[in-house]
Amino acid sequence: MSEAGERRQGIQSVGIGLRVLEVLASQNGAAALGAIAQASDLSASQAHRYLASLIAAGMARQDAATGRYELGS
């Protein structure tokens, strides 16, 4: 992939991650993976990968009891 292509992909990934964060911020409480995926226009597997990255960065968290996601603290 060319350098320009890599930059475009990186920017797209950041935009998608921000969209997932916006969905989390708009929820009243924790949300299920399917709801986050649908609101973000992603497949469940794509949303799960973005959520895993956001959790690793401390920007989101998953409730161990319910499996639902919300903004990190």
Describe the residue ranges of each PLM region:
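N-terminal helix-turn-helix
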Residues: S2-S73
